[in-house]
């Protein structure tokens, strides 16, 4: 009911001109938008969006609506333009995006080191394999014997996969800092083989969704005006790691050329990004870093810059991007950061 009321409010504000007014009131605020995967609808396994997914149609709509108010550039110091970013570094993030958006749209891809030159879907980021397991495992009861699992008996039905992800798999993953989730994944594989999970997906889906960019592709993307940034080595929640593990994820394996570029935290919310992680990012030489929150709250600095995740609904998209929703929730305008790359 609440969601319906918000959608109705967004619709009224759009057609009444209030949204346009808030675009003007927030003209000094730089908009950075986060995307993850853009996958053709016909490739989705069982029609499911596993993880953060846009279809080609939903992504195209968002780009068209953005362009009504902003040019799209990679200039983070230009508040008059909007910057689009893509987290993780899977093949679809350039291949499908560039096809849909056209050559005039350039973005920033934040890549996890584990995915560079990785063409093996069974060795994708652990968190993505866990999501595919819980979404595609057949209905039934599975017994998981692993130290960090919060509930050993998994009863999977058609309608409870999101609940199981949020309340069982995700907290069990976060607690598994010793193996960064690989031990948990092996335990699930023992209960129902991962190869059987991925067999439900088409080869083209697996290539686009679960294989990474090659070094040659990264060079080509850069030549075409895109930017490649760092997104840690293995995409594990940083706040759950030791200081040594954090430095490995953030600094040790980061290519030198990426350290002059903005950094993106995996997950990018308060529980996954602690102060120590932000300090390591700064000391490693990155000029700034992005969160996945519109309001960074008390973390008001250029090492936790805000990003928008846009709705698939046109009216909610403008309600959010204009800053009107933010104003109604917080009684203030969007935060302004002057020249974060300086």
Model-identified regions with their sequence ranges:
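A structural motif corresponding to the C-terminal end of an alpha-helix
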Residues: 65-71, 103, 215-227, 256-258
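C-terminal active-site subregion of NodB/CE4 polysaccharide deacetylases
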Residues: 1-85, 239-342
